[in-house]
Amino acid sequence: MIEDDPSIADMYRVQLEHDGYRVTVATTAELGFITVAENSPDLVLLDLLLPDRSGFEVLISLNERLPNHPPVVILSNYGEPSMIDRGRSLGAVEYLVKSRVTPADISSQIPTWIAVGRRGGQGES
C-alpha cells in the first residue's frame, strides 16, 4: 500500500491483515516504487495525493520501468470522472473513492483484482 496518511494506512492494514493478507505500507511515491520493485507484491493499493509525487506519476513510472508490475488499485479522495478515467487509462484495475468503500469491501475484492492483473486486464470492475 502506498499511502501517506498513517491513520488511513492503519485502518486498511488492520482489516487486510485480519483477512490473512501481508501488508507493507510505503508513505511516499519513491518508497512505494522501491517497495514494489524489490518485493513484487500481488497487488498495489495506491493513493493519489502523496508528499513527493502524485499517485499517477507512480503508476506511470511502474508502467515505464516495471512493465510486468502487479495490478494497481487507486484509492483516492478524488471522485471526479476525469480522475477516474485517467487512472484507468494508465492501467489501474480499479479506481475507488475512499469515502465510498470500507476496508472490508476492499479486502473482499482483492482476489478479483489479482486475477484481473494476472490476465493482463485493466480498468475492469
Residue positions per predicted region:
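Conserved acidic carboxylate
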Residues: 3
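Acidic catalytic/metal-coordinating carboxylates
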Residues: 28, 54-57
